[in-house]
């Protein structure tokens, strides 16, 4: 038992390189990732896991489309998609570090591109599910998410620190919220509209806060040069 704990702790140290997490579930999530990377067959590469993560996001987008045109029960497919996305997206880079084959810049670029394709697919499903009268909310959601990605990249450029979390909230917490919202929408049809408005407003407020903080960092860096 003690030996297994020491092994898990060592793996945790390896996979935590180059990434500082602040999200609520980080303690349990990192332990789960440390366990899973040891179980991934050698024939599975980090690129394959990235592709699996993308498939998960595409499934979430598809669930909205099927929910809009066939039956809202298809939204439950999005729950499976969230789990698949977490598996691929969380393990791809960490697996590379575990196998001592980190590709920092390649992985960074691939992550950003795949995330953008995935969120666009979800956004398209978002818009179709909400209907034409509320499509501006869907566009707003995509725009706010895109701005969040831009701020993250600029923060990395200015501070040389890359973080995928915004305070206590990270991608995993967002997935959990999406899962909860999908379940509620299946039970109480129409509630998704209110969530969409709320989520877009939260992203707007978060982007304003992070943007102002980013300008402060940029100003401090200019003054230090």
Regions found by a protein language model. Give the residues of each.
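Hydrophobic alpha-helical transmembrane segments
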Residues: 1-79, 122-225
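Basic, amphipathic juxtamembrane/active-site segments
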Residues: 82-84, 93-134
């Amino acid at each position: 038992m003690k030996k297994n704990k020491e092994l898990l702790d060592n793996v945790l140290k390896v996979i935590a390189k180059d990434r500082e997490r602040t999200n609520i579930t980080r303690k349990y999530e990192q332990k789960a990732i440390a366990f899973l990377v040891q179980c991934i067959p050698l024939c599975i590469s980090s690129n394959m896991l990235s592709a699996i993560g993308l498939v998960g996001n595409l499934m979430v987008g598809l669930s909205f489309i099927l929910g809009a045109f066939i039956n809202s029960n298809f939204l439950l497919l999005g729950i499976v998609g969230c789990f698949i996305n977490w598996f691929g997206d969380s393990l791809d880079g960490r697996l590379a570090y575990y196998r001592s084959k980190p590709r920092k810049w390649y992985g960074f670029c691939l992550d950003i591109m795949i995330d953008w394709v995935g969120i666009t697919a979800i956004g398209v499903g978002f818009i179709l599910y909400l209907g034409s009268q509320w499509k501006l909310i869907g566009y707003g959601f995509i725009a706010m998410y895109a701005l969040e990605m831009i701020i993250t990249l600029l923060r990395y450029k200015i501070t040389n620190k890359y973080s995928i979390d915004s305070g206590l909230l990270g991608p995993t917490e967002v997935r959990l919220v999406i899962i909860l919202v999908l379940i509620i929408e299946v039970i109480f049809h129409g509630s998704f509209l209110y969530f969409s408005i709320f989520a877009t407003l939260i992203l707007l407020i978060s982007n304003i806060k992070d943007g102002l903080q980013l300008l402060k960092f940029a100003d401090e860096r200019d003054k230090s040069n």
